């Protein structure tokens, strides 16, 4: 590779040698190709992205380095400035803008998408774009943005895509090659640090696999299986010897023999085995915090005096800007004590300053045990020697579900620090009550190939309005057809298309045999098929009428009514013992003349005649007693004789039962039957043989049409969604003009500048003046209603203006809610996915914050509101920053100068205190 001068210069500055996959990817990049790199977490994919930065700087061009998360952008900005200096590296996120005109800019993917739609001057001279963590393309919320960027990037820009290992890397690479041109796909499934799988049973740590086995795929460790069998047997014996414990089974009492380890004990075992630092995945924020508290109540200490001094220095640096009044509210002192002992939690509910301090200390090896939610696995650079999984199930917001192989791979991929550890370790804690933590289940997860990448691309209002603005409908359709979603859909119908081709060929052969597609025998067969179809439909309607008539009678029956059961094995006379409880599916309790008692339905009583009479019943009828049934059946027969009830064998006169049988005399059906009788093929020689072939032709024709419908549904779904959205936007005057040449209106240009999940609702609020005349805190509050989502299953509760602190804000919330309801009704009519409804769960909180800046009062008010789960400091900051992002858009896009000025003042009122500290 002597021609690769820049690669030689780049590698000369590295303190390590490149792996083969890194060498191949970098070489392809220097030769002018785009590159897709799929490799495990920690394998060193980012080296390829950093080489793209090197190439851009060496050639005097520009490189944009995109990430899906602001935290990742901040981290990459720090890494690149350490190497190239602050003057050459910029940062653009929703919160920060640093050196935005630098030759290398780190940004979130959304920022680049917005630049592309605005045709920003910053795109001039752009030579390389790095898309880190590109597997986020499968994310429901962020994924579409990635596809928009990939599709809109100029053709001369070299794209470097970095992805975790996915099982369909070749498919994804094939799509990238299709839409971006010459792209080299580099897939490497080799972990640079070997991963050893373990199961912790009680206080004993076992290898999951028998690594000494000579077979190709290591079997489950037999010693582990024997020990678990011994534990289960000991539990059973413990139950057998202790009757009290047997009685407690089912009440949640644990067997005495096996005791689950407390978290401090697990960490102590890992420490003794030399397996720290470790990340323990807990899958709930509360569980992470509780785990640290458990450890703090124990004697566990993992740091030396020297390490504690270094930890204190980092804490003071990270948290020095926090107000003293806020520290106690934030749980600072307990958090600090945990860090000094080498323990920490890590989750999205933490204050960003706290979370970043944990990341820095863990990466430095000063914090030894972190209890984290799975969000830590999403790209944050915090590798550990060991990863511990307490459970192999997690709550997905609705129910507890097992981890998928892809999730297991992503979590355990954190184990093993390249350049530090010789090997990484994954430890699953065994629980006797959970099948998912059994060795076979764990082995299945550990052995499975990783998750497939699935597109989540679907047109949004903002995307649609921008496409209409920049290109014709035909070009927009063509662009949508180039999406990864459409690429996958097209590949999925390959088999269907082949089926259509085979059907078409067979239909042609049969048609030739019968005399062409208009052959008389085919016309005759179609007549027969149409008649049969109409007869089936009439039969269905007739059965429905009979059932409804029977249900009407059954629902009207009263205690003591005598009826005639016309169908089933219980046919004959019966008396009603108890009326039906449910009129939609009436099932009265009856006793028959043959002494059977039970509930009947329309299937037993297919008649519409009124009861034939009635009889007096005792106040209480114990129908389960044989003697009572015998006496009552005798009384029933006597009453029937007295009332001259006809025998069931006489049948029921269909002309008198009240059904609407006019459908049986359908003129169209009569006409078709007449045509069939007169048809020239009716008495043709060899009719039966020809008819069999003709009917086969029709069966294949129907199947072929079914295949074609499936293909059409799969291959045109995005274009149809786009056209429906265009139709709604035309109706609302965001777009005008003929369908073949639509033009974006002033309101449409406003919508094109709003980037939010509720983009169209925000645009409607701006153009209708729903948010006019508000004060800064009120504007921040109403903006939060179109962004905030209550956590858990609580959902938005009550009227959206229920918590409005001022009449002006209440009116704005009501106006917003009405606009949302109208929009959702229009979406339903146009068959578009419904927009989310406004949620008032953050209204009072951010109003209080914008007015007072008092964190203690704000969090106390949030807890007192009872609006879903308690609001953590981290969530509070995160939602405030989302509000800031939309307020910043209003400051630039709102049509009214007063509203723009109010948005600017609202930004200042919200961006203070903990919200302004350590934005990330």
UniProtKB/Swiss-Prot annotation:
Stored Gene3D superfamilies: 1.10.3380.30, P-loop containing nucleotide triphosphate hydrolases
All residue ranges annotated as the Helicase ATP-binding domain in the record: 26-184
Superkingdom classification of source: Bacteria
Record: residues binding ATP: 39-46
BP GO annotations: nuclear-transcribed mRNA catabolic process, 3'-5' exonucleolytic nonsense-mediated decay
SUPFAM superfamilies, per database record: P-loop containing nucleoside triphosphate hydrolases
InterPro entries per UniProt: DEAD/DEAH_box_helicase_dom (IPR011545), Helicase_ATP-bd (IPR014001), Helicase_C-like (IPR001650), P-loop_NTPase (IPR027417), RNA-DNA_Helicase (IPR050699), Ski2/MTR4_C (IPR012961)
Short sequence motif named DEVH box, residue ranges: 132-135
Segments forming domain Helicase C-terminal: 265-469
A single cellular component GO annotation: Ski complex
Keywords: ATP-binding, Helicase, Hydrolase, Nucleotide-binding
Family the entry assigns: Belongs to the helicase family. SKI2 subfamily.
Record-given protein name: Probable helicase HelY
Taxonomic source organism: Mycobacterium leprae (strain TN)
